[in-house]
Amino acid sequence: AIYLKNKEKIFTIGNSKAVNNNNTITASNLNYDKIKNIYEAKKNVVVNDYEKDTTIYADEITYFKNEEKIFTSGNSKAVNENNTITANILEYDKIDNIFKAKKNAVANDSEKDSTIYADEITYFKNEEKIFTKGKTKALIKNKYKFNSENVSYYRNLGDLISQKRSSVEDDSGNTYKLESFVYNINKEMLRGKDVDVFAKVNENKIDQYFFSEGFFDFKNQSHIAKETKIKIHKNVFENEMLK
């Protein structure tokens, strides 16, 4: 280690570790500015926050100890309880317990078996809320695919919500295009407005339905809808006549 006494700065190279309060930082290289109370770590960085039960991994981190904020760059990951967030860039506000992930952001909820992909993700850990910014994809229980933008996810309720034009694909190959939606992960229930449903009959045939509002029970494969318009694939009546 190198200690510049006049500047109150410490530089370390190789297998470095900083321990303070309920946090530890390990990395190949560590710099500490004692006056500003700022840590900079590079290469194989791991931050353990024992108070919040959170571990952060990254290529580089800057830890502003006075403000209790961490900024990461490159191959960033935050892990706590049943959740994992990965991105190129992470910001962690320890006091408010808020994570912000930018660029190729992914939030995985292993308990709910759901993964959200977005340009930007903000996770309010205390309230168990996630808000995305920009184009957003979600994969629920490895069965239901969502394409939307500016999505809200209320983890305790199991609600995935968007007021933007969206599409949903179920595990039977049916596609739902909606002006807005609320999906409950626990009940596997989709509610949407101005819904176009493309129901897959087989590989070459699709029935199309329009509902001004619809409630779709994926688990029991049933629905309740208002103002229904039906466009049936052209071979339906031909097949009936041949019977």
Which ranges hold each PLM region?
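Structural signature for solvent-exposed beta-strand/loop edge elements and short helix-capping sites
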Residues: 1-243
